[in-house]
Amino acid sequence: MWILIYLFIIWSSLRTWVTAVDSTTTVGDDLNETVSTSVWPTMSPQMTVAFRSQRDVMGNLTIDQLPYVGLNLRRVLLNNETSMVNEGNNTRLLTLFKSMLSSEANAFVLDLEQYNNDLRVVDTTLLFSDVLIALQSFIFSTQNNLYANIIVLLLNISAPELDSTEYRHQNQTLNTTYILDKNLGNSFIYKPTDLQSDRAKNNTWNIYGKSSIDGWPTLGSVLYEQKKRLVIGELTDFFNETTAPYIFPHDVFHYEQGNSTLDCPSTVEGLTDLSSIHWRFLDSLFNSVDIKEYISCGLSPIISNSAYVNNVTQLADIIHEGSVWSWDSDQPSVTQSTSKSGSSSGTLEAYNCVLLYYFANNETVTWRVGNCYNSNIGLCRYENMAFRWLVRSNKATYFDFDSYQGSKCPDQYSFNIPRSPLEQRSFIAYMRNSSFSDTQIWIDLNSISVSNCWVSGGPYASCPYEKVISRRNFVTMMVPASVCSFALLCIVVYLSVLRVPIYDNRKNWRRVINKISKSELEGVPS
């Protein structure tokens, strides 16, 4: 019995320990997890962390204002695959498409044509349903907080060469809802009805604040609350609300080809006016230099460069330059643990906080990891105004700049960070107008709680990807259970080795009792 009790105690202690270990799984363990690809270069751990942290910073931006980097699939994917398509090798095309999904591109333009009451990819024998199945597979494999992101699919529909009566009949018999439901599932699609519902619930915003008229939901709301991953839009005028209720009409998107008609803003008023335009796409040829400029001007580039399998890496570099608009080329530094250490000079070091570097000579900025214990000035934003900044002149460590005791930012300002290329552009304009020289500035981004998990919300913000148990809390939790287990173990060992005195003297007691019983007289005394 005692042995069973002891084994139960040991099992309980081990279970507690395993639970604690499981709950402290770090994001660093996930750095080597990437969606497998066979054509496109996979993202390095550093690039994965940079892309994820950027997505998290943009969590409170509306999905129509996000900087997307896209690919025109007809120009990029299908221009050199004609012979392969004629051979009926659709597997190769789907492999290329899947590898592109695993890149940093998150918008795709797809040309379709109607074919026997179905939709087919132009110049191929590939059906739209095949593309949707590949898309569904990718969404399933990335449907978690680490890898989930919004994908925009823009459709160019070619009408069949029929007279007007036949065209209307073909259009009405084409059931896009059935195609999407069967091959993708509507649970992943953010639909026009979802937008209507969000606006009715006052869950949408524009540049001025909440708006039930022309607002859109935030990235965080769509990804994490509604679990939506895909926005489908039409660039032509083939469908209508009845024939394609899952697809946004063409007038929702500002889509241009070649050169943009939108000016690149340099004032707060210009930035505000540009932000009132939803879904700003530019389909053109780009290189790794000018794509960054278009991104900083608030446009989402759709790359139409002709690409081949042997130079796909060059195209991947262009996408990367447009996708990562914040971090420096070798940032953020990927670490395996978060710890506080002392340097040879005796000062504390913790490289888990982010500095924004401003270079006055070419008016550029970039993000780099810095020592949280160094003293620097910090960046403040005025209430909920996206483009109104203030840099405090008083220096402080990262922990002191925004702490439980209060922020170094003045009233109505808060410690903050540029959340988009447009906001970063407005910050550059502020620095230029204020005549700042080269400067290093604390911004609200750190990985103090968990290595490689970059979060906003001050020095005490927690990582959303894991439940953190510190070493101190772990020891506090384990010591009582260990002491009790050891004490009970000692008792069990003592009772199993040593005999109780009464048990040892059992025979002696029996002999004494027998002797006493013999001395007693039998019968009734006279």
From Swiss-Prot:
Glycans are attached at residues 32, 60, 80, 89, 156, 171, 175, 202, 240, 259, 311, 362, 433. Residues 499-526 are cytoplasmic. GO terms for cellular component: membrane. InterPro entries: Telomere_Capping_Maintenance. Keywords: Glycoprotein, Membrane, Signal, Transmembrane, Transmembrane helix. It is found in: Membrane. Residues 1-20 form the signal peptide. Coiled coil: none annotated. It comes from the Eukaryota. It is a single-pass type I membrane protein. The chain crosses the membrane at residues 478-498. Residues 21-477 are extracellular. May be involved in telomere capping. Belongs to the MTC6 family. This is Maintenance of telomere capping protein 6. The gene is MTC6.
